[in-house]
Amino acid sequence: MMTHWPSPAKLNLFLYITGQRADGYHTLQTLFQFLDYGDTIGITPRGDGEIHLLTPVEGVENDDNLIVRAARLLMKTASAHGRLPAGSGADISIEKRLPMGGGLGGGSSNAATVLVALNHLWQCGLSVDELAETGLTLGADVPVFVRGHAAFAEGVGEILTPVDPPEKWYLVAHPGVSIPTPVIFKDPELPRNTPKRSIETLLKCEFGNDCEVIARKRFREVDAALSWLLEYAPSRLTGTGACVFAEFDTESAARQVLKQAPEWLNAFVAKGVNLSPLQKAML
């Protein structure tokens, strides 16, 4: 029987680049919050040890898809711990709503949902810590989706402290361009020396995103989207883009602005939530 699992979006409510390590990775401080909006992953367990992705993503080989990689990595990890029941496999499908290269964490969220769901369905019994550690090898953002609570992240994004920022309503807009993360992080003009601050200090300051100036400069679509949103509410880039978002106190206020969105913007309204929809599904 197929079961359905939420794979929610995230927003970076702020994102500051505090340095760059010798290995090229950037150190940062960021605040993750989930949205009650995202992809849906369907999973039907198999008994022959095979992993089949029933809904391939255009332009991505199945073996390279984070969904397939996550499933196979869980197999390997659980097997190494002697916790993989014989014949564990799955047919997996995805109903995709989150854009690729949008800064909403779609691929990382998909991987985390697969790890959490298959750990449950296969009855592997891996702990949240073990799943998060496994997920980190797939991407720096995967652990926050596995843990499922809004978090302040440091290091390269792997040091997580649970926090409970206000749960606002957001209008999120995708300007029709995909921004690969390396494009932003390799840009010579990216600020890389923002001073580190405590979470208490950061929460009292106006939120910002160090990647925003680069995304606006290099992608006119992002600049146009932000220019439009800023007419209505405080707005900024999420992650390395391309999505931008504006915050509102009420759903009705966000939807009033959504009605005025230009046709070239793909926009939606969602609520920020500190407990991930995936975690709620596990309760």
From Swiss-Prot:
Disulfide bonds: none
Residues annotated to bind ATP: P99, M100, G101, G102, G103, L104, G105, G106, G107, S108, S109
Reaction(s) catalysed (UniProt annotation): 4-CDP-2-C-methyl-D-erythritol + ATP = 4-CDP-2-C-methyl-D-erythritol 2-phosphate + ADP + H(+)
GO molecular-function term, one example from the UniProt record: 4-(cytidine 5'-diphospho)-2-C-methyl-D-erythritol kinase activity
The enzyme's E.C. designation: 2.7.1.148
SUPFAM superfamilies: GHMP Kinase, C-terminal domain, Ribosomal protein S5 domain 2-like
Alphabetical UniProt keywords: ATP-binding, Isoprene biosynthesis, Kinase, Nucleotide-binding, Transferase
HAMAP family noted in UniProt: IspE
Annotated family: Belongs to the GHMP kinase family. IspE subfamily.
Protein name: 4-diphosphocytidyl-2-C-methyl-D-erythritol kinase
Organism this protein belongs to: Citrobacter koseri (strain ATCC BAA-895 / CDC 4225-83 / SGSC4696)
Taxonomic path: Bacteria, Pseudomonadati, Pseudomonadota, Gammaproteobacteria, Enterobacterales
